Amino acid sequence: MSREPPPRHLSITVNIYYHGADGSARRFAEEMTASGTVDAIRAEPGNLRYEYFVPLAGGETVLLIDSWEDQQALDAHHASPMMSAIAALREKHDVRMTVERYVTDEAHDAAADRAFVRE
């Protein structure tokens, strides 16, 4: 009798690059934070990380790293009323997005990468 392997836990990370003009991407991220929207998203079940970054070289792009425990948690976030608040702020600040999506690679032996990490 063959047994099915246990389901793999595949966390999801979405990198969203917000692009705008005249500082609009940065103002968008600042208002997301000041309005409490960022804290509310971080409190959603399954959220692992929701954090904005600004490039050292400046420019008109802000990076959001948005990580979730699994697809169900991300789907619940997308179905939440939070999305209309986010969409309204995107519209208000006239930002555009480029999106990259990553799924955890549990099959890879991360120990092999440790030699390159300074802790």
What annotation goes with each model-predicted range?
Residues 11-19, 49-80:
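Short, well-ordered beta-strand segments in beta-rich or mixed alpha/beta enzyme
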Residues 19-32:
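Short, surface-exposed ligand-recognition loops at beta-strand->loop->(often short) alpha-helix junctions
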Residues 13-17, 31, 101-103:
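Generic alpha-helical hydrophobic packing signal
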Residues 1-10, 52-60, 85-119:
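Glycine-rich beta-strand-turn "strand-cap" elements at beta-sheet edges
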Residues 4, 12-13, 29, 45-47:
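Short, flexible segments with low predicted structural confidence
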Residues 35-48, 67-103:
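An amphipathic, aromatic/His-enriched active-site/gating alpha helix that lines ligand/cofactor pockets
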Residues 25-27, 59, 73, 108:
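Intrinsically disordered, low-complexity acidic/polar segments
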